[in-house]
Amino acid sequence: MFHKTLFSSICVFLLVGFCHSSADGQIGVNAKPAEGAEVLFDGTREMLDQKWTYWKGPRFSSSLPVKWKIVQDPVDRGTVMMTYDPVAAGGKYGTADLVTKMKYEDFRLHVEFLIVKKGGNSGVYLQNRYEIQVLDGDKTKHGMGAVINETPSPYFAYNGVGKWNAYDINFRAARFNGDQRSEKAIVTMFFNGKKVHTNQSINQVWGGPNSGI
């Protein structure tokens, strides 16, 4: 994510392996981790440093330790992660994005975010390849909740600026025979508890050297 008007969630967690249905755990804002889930962020600086690092693509211009801040939740109790790094000021994407230190194949991901100003823009990258858009005010295929540039924005499910939102993403990675892709990546997603993408094939890679998660 970039220096935008976005707070990342109090709790980010992930189930690795087969992508189970939503019936196997809670979904939506304030969901609790399902049994066996790996918590990726719990509101603490310790976990931020333990499990996250900068994505060192060609535009990277920051340096460790991670400059993103732990701040008080602007809505509820607790602490959250603010997506701010001075080098990314002015929307210079790719200069200070974060990625998990671990790599994952098939998984179910829960992430909560809060946009504090109109037009806030970021994104959730899956495997540094595929982007689920986070963009206030945009209802197009490049807009909020879209598999970017491939599906319409499910903007109807968005809670709006100043409120917490949640993506629950079931992701099945692409399959390959050698260098040839044999099966496309597939995503099913719930946005604030509403099912908005169902077994959606992902055709294009939007991540890579210029982008992070």
Language-model features, listed with the residues they occupy:
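Carbohydrate-interacting regions of secretory-pathway proteins
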Residues: 21-213
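Bacterial N-terminal signal peptides
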Residues: 8-17
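Positively charged n-region of N-terminal signal peptides that target proteins for export
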Residues: 1-5
